[in-house]
Amino acid sequence: MPSFDVVSEANMIEVKNAVEQSNKEISTRFDFKGSDARVEQKERELTLYADDDFKLGQVKDVLIGKMAKRNVDVRFLDYGKIEKIGGDKVKQVVTIKKGVSGDLAKKVVRIVKDSKIKVQASIQGDAVRVSGAKRDDLQSTIALLRKEVTDTPLDFNNFRD
């Protein structure tokens, strides 16, 4: 019986590349000359450092631009509070979301069941498994979910025939 998994996970290799490119651009830009602006990554957590709120916004814009170029959906980013650190410097912690939350999983299952497509959806941890008799039904389910769920980036993987 063909099936696939609905997951929500950022490509961490591309995130790392985007962070490195952002740091490279920040180090060469004229408006950041002499400032301590940078982006650091620890696992699924990014920390943005800058001299003031305005420069922090610019660092954020550079990071978002680099992520968009590397096809990393910026809806994965969850921005924390802006914190003041020593003097005028500020930092902001950005976490990268992973997994389909319980509410989103229930929403996906409800959309699949209400669609009257002959497939079954079941929640399995931080993913939703969709299985059906025909491959065409699964492909129409993928199209339906891409159209209906716009607030969270969804990936479809583990396609089994």
UniProtKB/Swiss-Prot annotation:
Name this polypeptide is given: Nucleotide-binding protein BMA0373
InterPro entries (UniProt xref): DUF520, UPF0234-like_C, UPF0234_N, YajQ-like_sf
Family indicated by similarity: Belongs to the YajQ family.
Job of this protein: Nucleotide-binding protein.
Swiss-Prot/TrEMBL keywords: Nucleotide-binding
Signal peptide range in chain numbering: none
Gene Ontology molecular function terms on file: nucleotide binding
One GO CC term, this protein: cytosol
Gene3D superfamilies found in the cross-reference section: 3.30.70.860, YajQ-like, domain 2
Disulphide connectivity of cysteines: none
